Amino acid sequence: MSVRSVIRGSGSALPRRAVSNAEMTTMVDTTDEWIVERTGIRNRYIAGEGETTSTLATEAARKALEAAGVDASRIDLIVLATATPDQTFPATATIVQHNLGCNGGIAFDVAAVCSGFLYALATADSMIRSGMARCALVIGAETMSRLLDWEDRTTCVLFGDGAGAVVLEAVDVDETDPKAPGILATRLHADGAHNELLYVDGGPSTTGTVGKLRMKGREVFRHAVTNLANVLKEVLETTGHDAEEIDWVVPHQANFRILDATARKLDLPADKVIVTVDHHANTSAASVPLAYDTAVRDGRIKPGDLVMFEAMGGGFTWGASLARV
């Protein structure tokens, strides 16, 4: 027997305000056809007054706890992935911890932008396997709208706000049982040589400002497809599974073209890929858990399914994780 981190439940949260492509056309020089053709996005949610990264994260966490049947008092670790914290410090995870009333455990943020949830998941998994924690909340939460240049039509139409969370619990499993639940393997990578392709042009130690998001979309697309396909293969090789065994792929919801191209490169059927980018747009670190929770709640992802999570973000950072849920 050995310890694995098992996903016990998931939750998600969205701001109140939905913004359609039609509404976007009143804000910037664009069209619904242009946005849909290039990205697949039709809608996004934008945070309003009183809605912050921590409020969205707290709501998603509460829903995940409810789905898992776990009381907040049992949570001894919160890892929150975000590029849009409420404040430079303290960590937004500590605010969520206080909101949930589970003070005293471990709580911190990780910053890997769109790959953030996978970095957070790997961190929590490692801490559970090492015995430092037994029951964890892993959260991806963003208010990306507050980093956008609303005069840059090439970027402001792509992003939205939201949060997703999962409860991870330490469980003793028989590793020889192919159906045993838990996270099987995660692989993470980064390459800072390309940080000028996707970045925010501000920060506390440089400009003293928040800054705005800047992106060179074509170059990002090229790197994304190659890196994601390679890291998925790496995880499959590590676990000894074949692509045909995967029940569902839950990718970072950046752009439908990237999702489609990556699936084609791995010969994965399109109907095995969870797609929510049309409804949520790119929610950065929130997109993977938000898509996962959507598919769990609508009945597509079921207990016992083999699920591959994957993402790539600014830095570049990228990774993939395979789990039996």
UniProtKB/Swiss-Prot annotation:
Q: Would the keyword Lipid biosynthesis turn up in this protein's UniProt record?
A: yes
Q: Which Pfam families match?
A: ACP_syn_III (PF08545), ACP_syn_III_C (PF08541)
Q: Which family does it belong to?
A: Belongs to the thiolase-like superfamily. FabH family.
The family database entries (InterPro entries) matched by this protein are listed as: ACP_syn_III_C, ACP_syn_III_N, FabH, Thiolase-like
Lineage, opening ranks: Bacteria, Pseudomonadati, Pseudomonadota, Alphaproteobacteria, Sphingomonadales
Entry keywords, A to Z: Acyltransferase, Cytoplasm, Fatty acid biosynthesis, Fatty acid metabolism, Lipid biosynthesis, Lipid metabolism, Multifunctional enzyme, Transferase
Broad enzyme group: transferase
The protein's name is Beta-ketoacyl-[acyl-carrier-protein] synthase III
Q: Which PANTHER family match?
A: 3-OXOACYL-[ACYL-CARRIER-PROTEIN] SYNTHASE, BETA-KETOACYL-[ACYL-CARRIER-PROTEIN] SYNTHASE III, CHLOROPLASTIC
The gene name on file is fabH
Where does the UniProt annotation locate this protein?
A: Cytoplasm
Q: Name one GO cellular component term.
A: cytoplasm
